[in-house]
Amino acid sequence: MKRRNFIKQLGGASALAMVGGLTLPSFTEQQKRHITILHTNDTHSQIEPFKPNHNRNPNKGGVARRATLIEQIRSENKNTLLLDAGDIFQGTPYFNYFGGELEFKLMSMLKYDVATIGNHDFDNSIEGLYKQLPNAKFDFVSANYDFKNTVLDTHVKPYKIMVKDGIKIGIFGLGIELEGLVSKKMYKETAYLDPIEVTQEITNQLKNEENCDLIICLSHLGYNYKRDAKKISDLNLAKNTKNIDLIIGGHTHT
């Protein structure tokens, strides 16, 4: 299938021992590896396709269509990663009624590998998110949310390491500051850590201690904030850190 068509509907990136213009130093020209990276973000409980008369996304989306695309691309390359950058919850009656159970079960059926947490994933409270974790047969990563005084302690890791076609891949997550965006009673004692400082520490660990060939950030910081230059975004993150090969972003629906 045409990758461009997939990207328009789902979002994805392919790598042939090269991601974001950075050649992986671990592999020579004779040792090229091929991985495919598929990703979603801000799906907001959109289980069904948008209606044909929808003003922005007529007859697009839906889990069934996503499943078909993913299956087709996996058949072309078994070394495929499937990632999500947060805001899985909220937006349709499916979430209002099932509280996230359906979203996690369907993502598990699609065999997602890793996801990070968005602000709307707290919409049914941190306890509500925790309650649904058994339905998620994939891992959650968040390096700058400290959950040690919450029910999510030990259930969300800062990063996950995977190996695809001999490429060692470190995947870590970052979330937006919740204060002022989400009611305190929803995220309880979740502590927000500076994404820049956390990233410098995590990427150094992944690169120099874990010896990862490729480092991916699942970010729910938002792409850019022109009206608030001090607010940390994906662009700020890229400019002020090193060792990230690929940022997969969410939140601003960019």
Task: Map each language-model feature to its residues.
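Acidic, metal/ion-coordinating pockets
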Residues: R3, I7-T254
